[in-house]
UniProtKB/Swiss-Prot annotation:
Pathway: Carbohydrate metabolism; D-tagatose 6-phosphate degradation; D-glyceraldehyde 3-phosphate and glycerone phosphate from D-tagatose 6-phosphate: step 2/2. The keyword Plastid does not apply. Belongs to the GatZ/KbaZ family. GatZ subfamily. One of its GO terms (biological process) is D-tagatose 6-phosphate catabolic process. One of its GO terms (cellular component) is plasma membrane. The keyword ATP-binding does not apply. Keywords: Galactitol metabolism. SUPFAM superfamilies: Aldolase. Forms a complex with GatY. Component of the tagatose-1,6-bisphosphate aldolase GatYZ that is required for full activity and stability of the Y subunit. Could have a chaperone-like function for the proper and stable folding of GatY. When expressed alone, GatZ does not show any aldolase activity. Is involved in the catabolism of galactitol. This is D-tagatose-1,6-bisphosphate aldolase subunit GatZ. The lineage of its organism: Bacteria, Pseudomonadati, Pseudomonadota, Gammaproteobacteria, Enterobacterales. It comes from Klebsiella oxytoca. Induction: By galactitol.
Length: 419
């Protein structure tokens, strides 16, 4: 990370795409995409995905071993993987008193650092049960400093060579917006400056001067966001003052919720010093598109009694267990079903680990692996992949088609020079 940031600050048009997903096919797609380059691949886990209690993926910081296992299968060198932790702080424990939530947050940070995660987002921006709303920025900074102190005490000297921190409080809701958005507030330059100033003071108060040298980025809102049905696109002019301010610091910006922006927007974001671009739902949205397309092919090619019924299984599970989508999607039945299937916030992603859904996806892939896929069907349902088949760049097998569909998202970031 430090090398990429140094190159950017030296004037090179370079950034990095942060892959925020715990889905094995997304991780495999990201590693395969850069298998034959010298690029680093940044893979991040959020605190609600991976924590000391398991998170919604059921994984603790053994997520590192999970990623490394996929890397070995792909043939990707583990030394080219950067592991990051996103929203590390009280996010998962906002319903608890601050003292208890922070105690768990400290343990969370220690677990991530001990496991070898080297990019740490110190996010203490959320109010806990006994906190005022919103939380005083000075309190946010003090709590972030306490989390940083835990990281510094845990890291070995070797780990500190690679350890980096991201600070900042203007973060989109972890997991996605719960309502529709009409517009988005671009962070003011003076607010970014205040964030840095309060964090520097809090760090120094705890004697964390050396740790300050490891702070590489500030999270801000450059004016990009999406909800279930719409996208707020980057407007460089609206963020002009913010983009200029960071040039006077040794840091860059980190932008969250950059999913679904145009290729040209990624190029402009990197140019304007939003050098760490986070993507998550767009990757699993592409995965979902590929699986739905393959399900349509299965209906054409496989006898009814042998089909995976993957789409029906997804519906059954999500309707029986609505906890991950109910408060986010529209209440009318037809609208809710459209959201379940096609929402840009892609809350299906929380259900892929479910045993019934996982088994049905495995059966879908097995069924179509045993069946020759007609080119006409591929053209009908995934035409971009059909073009690559025609150029002999891709094999007509389900696994490869899914990976390539996910990699279409990564290609847009690569166009913007987010390696």
């Amino acid at each position: 990370m430090k090398d990429i940031i140094s190159r950017h600050k030296a004037g090179e048009h370079i950034g990095i795409c942060s892959v925020c997903s715990a889905h094995p096919l997304v991780i495999e797609a990201a590693l395969s995409f850069d298998l034959h380059t010298n690029n680093k691949v940044l893979i991040e886990a959020t605190s609600n995905q991976v924590n000391q209690f398991g998170g919604y993926t059921g994984m603790s910081c053994d997520f590192r071993d999970f990623v490394n296992k996929i890397a070995r299968e792909v043939g990707f060198p583990s030394e080219r993987i950067i592991l990051g932790g996103d929203h590390l702080g009280p996010n998962c424990w906002q319903g608890e008193p601050a003292a208890e939530a922070m105690e768990k947050s400290v343990d969370l940070i220690k677990a991530y650092v001990a496991a070898g995660f080297s990019k740490i987002h110190l996010d203490a921006s959320m109010s806990c049960a006994d906190d005022p709303v919103p939380l005083d920025p000075a309190i946010v900074a003090e709590r972030a400093a306490r989390l940083c102190q835990a990281a510094e005490e845990t890291a070995t000297d070797e780990q500190k060579r690679h350890l980096t921190y991201v600070i900042g409080t203007e973060v989109p809701v972890p997991g996605g917006e719960a309502s529709t958005i009409g517009s988005v507030h671009v962070t003011r330059a003076q607010d970014a400056a205040a964030t840095l100033e309060t964090h520097e003071a809090a760090f120094r108060k705890l004697g964390l001067n050396a740790a300050l040298e490891r702070v590489i980025a500030i999270v801000v809102q450059p004016g990009v966001e999406f909800d279930h049905t719409q996208i707020i696109h980057y407007q460089p002019e609206a963020a002009k003052a913010l983009s200029a301010w960071i040039e006077g610091t040794p840091m860059v910006y980190e932008a969250h919720s950059t999913d679904y922006q145009s290729r040209q927007a990624y190029w402009a974001l990197v140019r304007d010093h939003y050098a760490i671009l986070k993507v998550g739902p767009a990757l699993t949205f592409a995965l979902r598109e590929a699986i739905f397309s393959l399900a349509q092919m299965e209906n054409e090619l496989v006898a009814p009694e042998s089909r995976s019924r993957v789409m029906e299984v997804i519906d059954e599970v999500m309707l029986n267990e609505p906890g991950y989508w109910k408060k986010y999607y529209r209440p009318t039945w037809s609208q809710a079903m459209a959201d379940i299937h096609f929402s840009l916030s892609d809350r299906i992603r929380y259900y892929w680990p479910h045993p019934r859904i996982r088994q049905s996806v495995e059966k879908l892939i097995a069924n179509l692996t045993e069946t020759k896929l007609p080119l006409g069907l591929i053209s009908q349902y995934i035409p971009v992949q059909f073009e690559r088949l025609s150029l002999n760049e891709l094999a007509a097998v389900p696994h490869d088609l899914i990976l390539d569909k996910i990699q279409d998202v990564l290609r847009a970031y690569r166009y913007g020079r987010a390696i």
